[in-house]
Swiss-Prot record:
Family, per entry: Belongs to the ATP-dependent AMP-binding enzyme family.
Protein's UniProt name: Plipastatin synthase subunit E
Cofactor requirements of the protein: pantetheine 4'-phosphate
CDD domains per the UniProt record, alphabetical: A_NRPS_Srf_like, DCL_NRPS
GO molecular function: phosphopantetheine binding; transferase activity
Top EC group: transferase
Bound cofactor: record note: Binds 1 phosphopantetheine covalently.
Positions of post-translational O-(pantetheine 4'-phosphoryl)serine modification: 1010
Region entry Adenylation, spans: 503-898
Condensation, as annotated region: 14-317
PROSITE patterns recorded: AMP_BINDING, CARRIER, PHOSPHOPANTETHEINE
Length: 1279
C-alpha cells in the first residue's frame, strides 16, 4: 500500500514493529471500511482546579508519551514483506497542547462552547497511519480553573487504562512542581502482551467456548419497549443511580457468604431478569473483562487495548435455588478465566446465532477512574484537584450496564435513545434494584419464585392501569334499554338494508310480533332459540324477539356447514329455530321452525311482551373453535353486553351515528355492531357480503350513507386499505382487530384520513367482544399496542402460577370485569380451567385468554403471540386440534398435523397428513368443507410418509417440511383457450401464488377464500377495468365459467350501453371508435397508458341504422358541451369521420380528430368472407353473438364512403411497418378533408399498433397530441 510505504519512509527511527490484537485489527478494519469521522474516538472531560502551568502540563504529558510505547504508535494496514497489518512504535513523538482562555464568557456560553468543541474534535477523527492518536485541549474558565478535553483513538487503550494514565500524570506533575526527580517504576510495553497472545492455545479456547454455548440457539435480547427507528444513528443517553449503603452492604455480605464475587452475584441477578423478559430458562449476554493475563509480570500497569467481551450464559434448572445458581456461575467463571482472551468474533462465528449471540453487555469497573485520581492526589499532595470526570465511551451495543463499586454501588445504564425510551429504562432501573434486593434478602429462594415486582409497581398495575370503573345501567337488560330508546326516538332510523329503512318504533313492533309468535308456539323463558340467517333485518328482528321472549339466541350463519349447525342446535338444546325467509332449505331441525320475514310481520301481533329478565340471564351463546375437535359455546349475559356498549371509554356512540354490520353473525364483533348502535340510538346499516368485499362499492357505500362508526377484522381491513387508504375518510371512528395489525397500512390510513379516530381493538369472545383498545395518534414502525382496558374491564399479566408479573415481562393476558362470560356451555372442566378466581378481588373471576402479552411503561398492553396452539385466521379464532380431529375422522387419513405459517404476509393453514395415495387434496378439502366453515379449511396440503417426532414421541411441528410453491402434478390440466381465460389465469396465479392452473380448477378448492377473491376483483378492476361483484366468483368459481360470464357481461353491456369507460379519469375526454372487431374494449391497453391524462371512452359498433345519431347522443350525455376530441382506429377512423360530420352539422364543436392508420374511403369494397381465426378463441356461449356484430360492421364499412369535409384538425398516425403486398401507396390520406392536418409515423404494423409491444410507443404519440390540444397548439407541418 503506497500510503503505508510513504509513511514508513518518513520515520527516521522505529523502535518496534509487531502485530495487532484481534480487537485492534477489528477497529483498524472498520476505521478504513466505514470512514465516518469520529468512529472509535473516545473522549474524557474533567475539571482541573488549582494554579495550572501549561508548560508543566505539556511536559507531564510528554513524559507519559515517552514512557509508554503505545502513545508513539501508528497503525499500518500493510507493511512491505510482512503479512497482515502492523503497529509501528516510533522512538520519538512530540506532543502539542491546545489551550484557550474562555473565562470572559458567561457560564452557559462556556458550556455551549466546550460542547461544540467536543463534537468538532470528535468529528475530526484521527489518521491511524500518521497522527499522534491522542489530543488534549485546555479551556480556562476562571481563575485557577480549567476544563480539559482528552481525546484518543480507542485502538490505543481501553477505559481501564485511563485511570493508570491520570494517576501517572498527577505523580509526574507533582514531581515537576516540587522540583524533584521523577521516580516511577519501569513499565513493560504492550508488545509483551501481543507476544503472549500470539503464543496461546487458540484451539483449546475455541473448544471451551463451543462446549459452554452448546445447544444455545435462541437470542435473549433486552426487550425494546420503544417504537423508534434504529436506522438514524446512535444517540447515547445515560441513567445513573446508586444503591443505598444498607443494600450495598447486604449484597457484599451475601456474595461473601456464598463464596462468590459481587460481579458474579450481579450477573446472576441480571440473567434471571433477562430470563423472565424472554420467557426462557437459558440466556446469554456479554460481559467485559479486563483481558490482562496474570501470568504476564507488570501487566496491571501496562497501557494498551486489553479488554475483551465474553458471553455469559445463565441457564437455570427446575427447582434450582438462587444460591445454587450462584455457586455454579462462580465455578463457570473460574473455568472460563484461561480463555477470556478469545476474540468474541471467533466465539460468535462458531455459534448458530453468529452476531445475534450478544445483545448487550455488563461492565464492572473494579477500580474507578475517579478513585484512582483521588488516591493519587492524596498521595502526592498535588497542587491540582481533578474532579467532575466524564468519560464518553460508545460501545457497539444499544445497552450497556456499568457497575462501579464503592460504599454505595453506582450503576449506569448507557443506552441508545433511538432504540430504548427513557420510561422503559427507568422501569428497568426499579426492577433491577428490586431484583438485587430480593437476591440479597432471599438467596435460597427457588428461581421459579424469583420476582422483581416491587410494591410501587404492583400498585401501579392493579390500581392505576386498571382504574376503569364508570357508571352504566348495569341493572338493566338489553331489552330494557332498547325499549327506552324506542320510546325516546321512535321515528329515528334503526335499521337500513338496501332500500328498506326501519324506525325504532317499527323495529320494536316487528320484534314484538315475532316474540309473540315464539311464545305462542311454546317458547319459554331461559330457553335457547337458534337463528339461521345471513346479514339481514330478519336477523336483527329475530335477536330482539328471542330476548323479548326471555330467551337466549344462538346465531347460526347461513354459510356454516349443516353438520356444524346441527351440532350447535343439539348441544344448546334449542327449542326453536328461526329461519330467514329464503333459507328454509338450509334448515335441518327436528324442532319447531319459524320463518322470519321482515316484510311479512303483521302489526296485529305487536303488543309488547311483559316477560321480566335479569341482567344475569343469558343473552346469547356464541361458538368458537375447540381443541377437542368440537366447538365451544360461550355463554354471554345481558349485563356482559350492556357493559360493552354503554358509557365506555372506547366509544362515544350516539343518535347521530351510523354503524354498519360487516362481520358474520356468528362472529362476536356483531355484538358491538348491533347493540353499540341500537342501545345508543344510532342507525345500523346492514349490507350484503358482495358489497362489503368489493372495495369500490364498499367505499362508495360508506360515503354515500355517511357511515360514522365501523369495525373491520384485520384481514379485511388490510385488503381494503391496500386498494384505497382514503376510503374511510368519512368515518369518525374505525376499529380494527382480530389479529396483529400492519403498521404500514395503519400509517397509510391515518395519513389519508386525518380526522379519523383509528383504534386497535382486542378481545376474546369469552370477555364479550372487546377487552382493550388503543387509539393510534402517530405512526408506528413496530407492533401497535392493543392498549388499555375498556371501561369496567380489567387486565393483568400473570405467570403460570397466577402471580402478577412486572411491566415488560411477558405472561398470560388475563381479563376481568363485567364483560367476563358465564363460561362454556356443558363444559364445566374447561370453564374451571380458564375462568379462574380473581387474584385481587374476592368473589370475582378472570378469563385466562391464552394470549401472551406484556405491559408497557405507559400502561398500554402489547400483544406478543398465542401461548397454546390456538390461532387466528382472518380474524376468526381457531384450534388446530379441532381441524386435526376432523381430519382423523375422514377415511384415508391416519395421522394429521395442522400448522400456521406466514406466506406473502398472510397467515395460512398447512395440513401435513399420512394417508391414502388415491385421494386428492381436492377430495380432502371437499370432505372437510362438509363439517367445517371455509376459514378452517387449510390452503396447503402435504402428504408425508411418516410424521417427524420429538424426543418424547410427539409430532415435531417445526420439522414438518415446507411445501414447494407449486401444485402437485396433475394428469388433466386444461390450459387457457382465449385471451380472457389467459388473463384470468395470470391473475389467479398472482393471487394464489401458484405456477400452474387449469381452467376447470375451483378457485376456493386451490387456496382461495373471500379475501383472496377480493384481490381478484380488485386486480380485474385495476388491470382490465372490469368491475364485477364478488358474487360472480362465488357463483362461477372456475376460470372457464368466469370467462364465459365476463364475455356475456361485456356483450350485454355492448348491446345495452354502446360505450364503456375504460379508465378512471383524465384532463379531457377521448371518444374512441373501434376496429372491425366492433368492441370498445379493444382500447383497454391505451386507456391504462393514458389514465389520469385522458378519460378514455370506447364505443362499440351499433348495429342499428340510427348508429350515428346514437353516437352523438352518447357523447353529449357524457360531455354536454364541446370541444370534443375523437379517435378512430382502422375501420373506426372511417366511422368516426361520419360521426364528426354529424356533430358539426348539429353545431357541436369537434376540435380534433385522431385517426390511427385508417385511410379515406372513396369507394365500396367487397366484404371479406375469409375464415376468421379469432372465432376459435371465443367461448362457445357468446361466439355467435360476437361474430354477428363483426359481420354487420364489415357490411357497413364495405359500403361506407367518406365524402365531404370537417372543420376539425386531423392528426393522422400511420403504421410504421407495412406489408409489401398491401398496396399501401395508392391509398388516400386526409389532408383535403379537414381544417388543419398533421401526420405522424407510428410504431409497428397495422394490427399491432394499440396492443402488445407497440401500444406504449403509440400511446406516447397520442399523449403528445392531447397535450398540444390542451395547450391550443396546432401542428401545421408534417412530422
Amino acid at each position: 500500500m503506497k500510503k503505508g510505504a510513504d509513511t514508513m519512509n518518513t520515520i527516521k527511527k522505529i523502535k518496534n514493529i509487531y502485530p495487532l490484537s484481534h480487537m485492534q485489527e477489528g477497529m483498524l478494519f472498520h476505521s478504513f471500511l466505514r470512514k465516518e469521522e469520529g468512529a472509535y474516538v473516545e473522549q474524557s472531560l474533567f475539571t482541573i482546579k488549582g494554579s495550572l502551568s501549561y508548560d508543566w502540563f505539556q511536559r507531564s504529558i510528554q513524559a507519559i508519551i515517552d514512557r509508554h510505547d503505545i502513545f508513539r504508535t501508528v497503525f499500518l494496514p500493510h507493511v512491505p514483506h510482512l503479512s497482515g497489518p502492523r503497529q509501528v512504535v516510533m522512538t520519538e513523538r512530540e506532543f502539542h497542547l491546545n489551550s484557550e482562555d474562555i473565562s470572559h464568557l458567561p457560564t452557559n456560553d462556556q458550556n455551549e462552547y466546550i460542547e461544540r468543541f467536543k463534537e468538532k474534535d470528535k468529528q475530526k477523527g484521527f489518521d491511524l497511519q500518521k497522527d499522534m492518536l491522542m489530543r488534549i485541549s485546555l479551556f480556562k474558565t476562571a481563575k485557577d480553573e480549567h476544563v480539559c478535553i482528552w481525546s484518543h483513538h480507542h485502538i490505543l487503550m481501553d477505559g481501564w487504562c485511563l485511570g493508570i494514565v491520570m494517576q501517572e500524570f498527577m505523580q509526574i506533575y507533582q514531581s515537576i512542581h516540587a522540583g524533584k526527580p521523577l521516580s516511577l517504576d519501569p513499565v513493560r510495553p504492550y508488545s509483551t502482551y501481543i507476544s503472549w497472545l500470539t503464543n496461546r492455545d487458540k484451539e483449546k479456547a475455541a473448544a471451551y467456548w463451543d462446549t459452554y454455548l452448546k445447544n444455545y440457539s435462541a437470542p435473549s435480547p433486552l426487550p425494546r419497549v420503544s417504537d423508534k427507528e434504529t436506522k438514524e444513528s446512535y444517540h447515547r443517553e445515560d441513567l445513573i443511580f446508586s444503591l443505598n449503603k444498607p443494600l450495598t452492604d447486604k449484597l457484599k455480605e451475601t456474595a461473601k457468604q456464598h463464596g462468590v464475587t459481587l460481579a458474579t452475584l450481579i450477573q446472576a441477578v441480571w440473567g434471571v431478569m433477562l430470563q423472565q423478559y424472554n420467557r426462557t430458562d437459558d440466556v446469554v449476554f456479554g460481559a467485559v473483562v479486563s483481558g490482562r493475563p496474570s501470568e504476564i509480570p507488570g501487566v496491571e500497569q501496562m497501557i494498551g487495548l486489553f479488554i475483551n467481551t465474553i458471553p455469559i450464559r445463565i441457564k437455570t434448572h427446575q427447582d434450582e435455588t438462587f444460591h445454587e445458581l450462584l455457586i455454579r456461575c462462580q465455578k463457570e467463571m473460574l473455568e472460563a478465566e484461561p480463555f477470556t482472551c478469545q476474540p468474541l468474533f471467533d466465539i460468535q462465528a462458531n455459534t448458530a446465532l453468529k452476531q445475534e449471540l450478544i445483545d448487550h453487555i455488563i461492565v464492572f469497573e473494579n477500580y474507578p477512574l475517579q478513585q484512582k485520581i483521588a488516591d493519587s492526589a492524596d498521595q502526592t499532595d498535588s497542587p491540582l484537584q481533578i474532579d467532575q470526570v466524564q468519560v464518553s465511551e460508545q460501545s457497539g451495543y444499544n445497552f450497556n450496564l456499568v457497575v462501579a463499586p464503592g460504599e454505595e454501588l453506582v450503576i449506569k445504564f448507557s443506552y441508545n435513545a433511538f432504540v430504548y425510551d427513557a420510561a422503559w429504562i427507568s422501569c428497568i432501573k426499579r426492577q433491577f434494584t428490586q431484583a438485587l434486593s430480593t437476591a440479597a434478602q432471599h438467596p435460597h429462594m427457588p428461581i421459579a419464585d424469583f420476582s422483581f415486582l416491587d410494591a410501587t409497581e404492583k400498585e401501579q398495575i392493579v390500581t392505576q392501569f386498571n382504574n376503569t370503573k364508570t357508571e352504566y345501567p348495569k341493572n338493566h337488560t338489553i331489552i330494557d334499554l332498547f325499549r327506552e330508546q324506542a320510546e325516546k326516538t321512535p321515528d329515528h332510523t334503526a335499521l337500513v338494508y338496501g332500500n328498506m329503512s326501519i324506525s325504532y318504533k317499527e323495529l320494536d313492533k316487528r320484534s314484538n310480533a315475532l316474540a309473540r309468535e315464539l311464545i305462542q308456539k311454546g317458547f319459554r323463558k331461559n330457553e335457547t332459540a337458534g337463528i339461521l340467517a345471513a346479514h339481514s333485518p330478519e336477523f336483527m328482528i329475530s335477536v330482539l324477539a328471542v330476548l323479548k321472549a326471555g330467551g337466549a339466541y344462538l346465531p347460526l350463519d347461513a354459510e356454516l356447514p349443516p353438520e356444524r349447525v346441527s351440532f350447535m342446535l343439539e348441544e344448546t338444546q334449542a327449542k326453536m329455530l328461526i329461519v330467514q325467509k329464503g333459507l328454509e332449505q338450509n334448515a335441518a331441525f327436528s324442532g319447531t321452525c319459524i320463518i322470519s320475514d321482515a316484510q311479512g310481520l303483521m302489526e296485529e301481533n305487536d303488543i309488547p311482551i311483559n316477560i321480566s329478565s335479569s341482567p344475569d340471564d343469558l343473552a346469547y351463546i356464541m361458538y368458537t373453535s375447540g381443541s377437542t375437535g368440537r366447538p365451544k359455546g360461550v355463554m354471554i349475559t345481558n349485563r356482559n353486553v350492556v357493559s360493552l356498549v354503554r358509557n365506555s371509554n372506547y366509544t362515544s356512540a350516539s343518535g347521530d351515528d351510523r354503524f354498519i354490520m360487516t362481520g358474520s353473525i356468528s362472529f362476536d364483533a356483531v355484538t358491538f355492531e348491533m347493540f353499540g348502535a341500537l342501545l345508543n340510538g344510532a342507525s345500523l346499516h346492514i349490507i350484503d357480503k358482495s358489497t362489503m368485499l368489493t372495495p369500490d362499492r364498499f367505499g362508495a357505500y360508506l360515503l354515500e350513507n355517511d357511515i360514522t362508526v365501523l369495525f373491520l377484522t384485520t384481514a379485511l381491513f388490510n385488503q381494503l386499505a391496500q386498494v384505497r387508504a382514503d376510503m374511510f375518510r368519512g368515518l369518525h371512528t374505525l376499529y380494527v382487530g382480530g389479529e396483529a395489525l400492519s403498521p404500514a397500512l395503519m400509517n397509510a390510513v391515518r395519513h389519508a384520513c386525518p380526522d379519523l379516530a383509528l383504534h386497535n381493538i382486542y378481545g376474546p369472545t369469552e370477555n364479550t367482544t372487546f377487552s382493550t383498545f388503543f387509539e393510534m395518534k402517530r405512526d408506528y414502525a413496530g407492533p401497535i399496542p392493543i392498549g388499555k382496558p375498556i371501561s369496567n374491564s380489567t387486565a393483568y399479566i400473570l405467570d403460570t402460577k397466577g402471580r402478577l408479573l412486572p411491566i415488560g415481562v411477558p405472561g398470560e393476558l388475563c381479563v376481568g370485569g363485567d364483560g367476563v362470560a358465564k363460561g362454556y356451555l356443558n363444559r364445566v372442566d374447561l370453564t374451571n380451567a380458564v375462568f379462574s378466581p380473581h387474584p385481587f378481588l374476592p368473589g370475582e373471576r378472570i378469563y385466562r385468554t391464552g394470549d401472551l402479552a406484556r405491559w408497557l411503561p405507559d400502561g398500554n398492553l402489547e400483544y406478543i403471540s398465542r401461548i397454546d396452539r390456538q390461532m387466528k385466521i382472518r380474524g376468526k379464532r381457531i384450534e388446530p386440534a379441532e381441524i386435526e380431529a376432523r381430519l382423523l375422522e375422514m377415511e384415508g387419513v391416519q395421522e394429521a398435523a395442522v400448522t400456521l405459517r406466514e406466506k406473502d404476509g398472510e397467515a395460512q393453514l398447512y395440513t401435513h397428513y399420512v394417508g391414502d395415495h388415491k385421494k386428492t387434496d381436492t377430495d380432502f378439502r371437499a370432505d372437510l368443507a362438509r363439517v367445517l366453515p371455509d376459514y378452517m379449511i387449510p390452503q396447503h396440503w402435504v402428504r408425508v410418509e411418516r410424521m417427524p417426532l420429538t424426543g418424547n414421541g410427539k409430532i415435531d411441528r417445526s420439522a414438518l417440511p415446507i411445501p414447494e410453491n407449486k401444485p402437485a402434478k396433475r394428469q388433466n390440466i386444461i390450459l387457457p383457450r382465449n385471451l380472457v381465460e389467459e388473463e384470468l389465469a395470470n391473475i389467479w396465479k398472482q393471487v394464489l401464488g401458484v405456477n400452474t392452473i387449469s381452467i376447470d380448477d375451483d378457485f376456493f378448492a386451490i387456496g382461495g377464500h373471500s379475501l383472496r377473491a377480493l384481490q381478484v376483483i380488485h386486480t380485474l378492476k385495476h388491470q382490465q377495468n372490469i368491475d364485477i361483484p364478488i358474487d360472480f366468483l362465488f357463483e362461477h368459481p372456475t376460470i372457464a365459467q368466469l370467462a364465459e360470464k365476463l364475455y356475456s357481461k361485456q356483450l350485454t353491456a355492448a348491446n345495452e350501453q354502446h360505450v364503456i369507460k375504460l379508465n378512471q379519469h383524465g384532463a379531457q375526454n377521448l371518444f374512441c371508435f373501434p376496429p372491425i372487431s366492433g368492441f370498445g374494449i379493444y382500447f383497454k391497453d391505451l386507456a391504462l397508458l393514458l389514465n389520469e391524462k385522458a378519460a378514455v371512452y370506447g364505443f362499440h359498433f351499433i348495429e342499428q341504422d340510427t348508429r350515428i345519431e346514437q353516437y352523438v347522443n352518447c357523447m353529449t350525455d357524457i360531455q354536454p358541451e364541446g370541444p370534443y376530441v375523437l379517435l378512430g382506429y382502422s375501420a373506426g377512423g372511417n366511422l368516426a369521420f361520419e360521426v364528426a360530420q354529424a356533430m358539426e352539422r348539429k353545431g357541436l364543436e369537434v376540435s380534433d380528430f385522431i385517426i390511427v392508420d385508417a385511410y379515406l374511403k372513396e369507394q365500396p369494397l367487397p366484404i371479406d368472407t375469409g375464415n376468421d381465426e379469432s372465432a376459435a378463441y371465443l367461448p362457445e356461449a357468446v361466439r355467435e353473438k360476437v361474430m354477428k356484430k363483426k359481420r354487420n360492421y364489415q357490411e357497413y364499412w364495405a359500403q361506407l364512403l367518406n365524402e365531404g369535409h370537417i372543420k376539425a384538425s386531423i392528426h393522422f398516425i400511420e403504421a410504421g411497418i407495412h406489408p409489401e403486398t398491401s398496396g399501401h401507396t395508392g391509398l388516400t390520406k386526409w389532408e383535403g378533408a379537414c381544417g388543419n392536418y398533421s401526420e405522424y409515423t407510428g410504431f409497428g404494423a397495422h394490427k399491432d399498433m394499440l396492443e402488445g409491444t407497440y401500444a406504449e410507443k403509440n400511446a406516447d404519440i397520442i399523449l403528445d397530441i392531447l397535450e398540444k390540444i390542451t395547450s391550443n397548439q396546432v401542428i401545421l407541418h408534417k412530422r
